Amino acid sequence: MILGLGIAGLNLCHQLEKAGKSFIVVDNCPTNSASLIAGGIYNPVVFKRKLKSWKADDLIPALIEAYNEMDSQLKITSLNHQFPILKPITTEDDLVEWKQVLNEGRLTPYIDSIEMGAPKGPFKEGFVAHTTIKNGGFLRIEKAILAYRDYLKKNGLFVQQAFDYSSLRITDSGVEYKNLSADRIIFSEGRFISENPFFGWVPFKPTKGQILTVKTDGSLTADRIYNQQFLLFPTEQRDVFKLGATYEWDVLDEIPTKASTEELLAKAEKVLNVKLQVLEEKAAIRPTVVDRRPVIGVHPKYENLFLFNGMGTKGVMIAPYFAKQLVNFIYDNGALDKEANLNRFLRRHYEKD
């Protein structure tokens, strides 16, 4: 049994199906979940430190494989978009650092050249050079989740209801929930982990994020992801883009704010000579962990309770690899990555009954 069908639950289902395992999903289908609102970007490079993103060499092949398989399974040919990520370079000092990175091969195979001058397009002056990141892209995440939800419903594998933790019974042979029974349950409820009486001790540090849907004046090409303290990438509508995202830790609600909208527009308009019309504003809470790593594994007391959560801001990139790892852990006694294993928090945060 899987609780939650966000990006984490989606990938769990996919890996369980590949392994030939049966399952059922329980989800309340919240319209404001972080997964449905997220941009779905994956980027193998951490621009601020000019390093590969954590485990990028493992995560990128895994996500490409998984999402291409979902394309075929759901008969949707536009879920995963491998788009180059355009990164302008604004100062001479920054250019020196990027050239050093290139010469050292620190970001191979994700960058292989630096172009002098501003990139093509409606960019304002002030760029000394630019580079393009390969093997990045984005997933049409809302489209993927909704299509997979429909697939599960048609096959009788989806129960739409709010989960009542008090109705979960742990038995010698597995778990029982109302009229459902299973060998185990995997909790993938995203930010709603705070309501979970079994895993509420895990140190999550949720963040609020806001994203905009904007219409442009037609001067932006829809063949890349624009990145310069913001992310701007195309939707399936002509001249309509997604612009994100903000980070807020104090006010944790799902209400878009004028301040966040203005912040995003200001960042984009500082770089681009383009008129942006806001069509929609959305906000959600991301299930991030204090150390910015996913948290997966088995409950220290109940061997039939598992956690797959904490995908945070990089869920699209992280979830495929670790979903496969968790499935292997459960069924084939595979190992869990130490940096992602739930056990890393036992000593300081878990109190035994």
Identify the residue ranges that each predicted region occupies.
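Short hydrophobic core segments
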Residues: 1-3, 180-192, 323
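Hydrophobic/small residue at the entry helix of a nucleotide-binding pocket
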Residues: 7-8
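Active-site substrate-recognition segment that forms the wall
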Residues: 11-19, 28, 36, 41, ...
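Conserved beta-strand positions in the Rossmann-like core of class I SAM-dependent methyltransferases
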Residues: 24
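Dinucleotide-binding Rossmann-like beta1-alpha1 core, especially the glycine-rich loop
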Residues: 41-121
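Short beta-strand to alpha-helix junction loop
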Residues: 50-62, 92-93, 131-147, 255-260, ...
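Helical element adjacent to the flavin cofactor pocket in flavoenzyme catalytic cores
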Residues: 131-184, 188
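C-terminal catalytic lobe of FAD-dependent flavoproteins
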Residues: 280-353
